[in-house]
Amino acid sequence: MVPLWWHISLGVALFVIGAAGVLLRRNILVVLMSLELLLNSVNINFIAFGRYYADFRGQIFAIFVIAITAAEVAVALGILVALVRNKSTLKVDDVTVMKG
């Protein structure tokens, strides 16, 4: 059996990569993919801890996170398509639609 710390270190590494992508990138699509990487790294940790403690709730919570993530991606891609049609850009800095 694989030790728990391998799963935790993989989850932490993916979380750091995703957080760096969200904070450092200016392309909306890359930020969205980095956010997905963040959520999937959390899912890895949920499943790893659930398996380590022989509890199925970690897997159930990961399934809920995946379902919520799918809805979030659908809404975000719809907004992304609307922004590309209106502004013709994918840069975060160029999008000031919500500014008053």
From Swiss-Prot:
Task: State the similarity comment.
Answer: Belongs to the complex I subunit 4L family.
Q: What is its main location?
A: membrane
UniProt-listed Pfam families? Oxidored_q2
Question: Which InterPro entries does the entry link to?
Answer: NADH_UbQ_OxRdtase_chain4L/K, NUOK/Mnh_C1-like
Give the source species.
Sinorhizobium fredii (strain NBRC 101917 / NGR234)
Lineage of this protein's species? Bacteria, Pseudomonadati, Pseudomonadota, Alphaproteobacteria, Hyphomicrobiales
Biological process terms from the Gene Ontology for this record are:
ATP synthesis coupled electron transport
Q: What is this protein called?
A: NADH-quinone oxidoreductase subunit K 2
| Keywords from the named record | Cell inner membrane, Cell membrane, Membrane, NAD, Quinone, Translocase, Transmembrane, Transmembrane helix, Transport, Ubiquinone
**Where can this protein be found?**
Cell inner membrane
User: Assembly and interactions?
Assistant: NDH-1 is composed of 14 different subunits. Subunits NuoA, H, J, K, L, M, N constitute the membrane sector of the complex.
Q: Corresponding gene?
A: nuoK2
Cite the EC number: 7.1.1.-
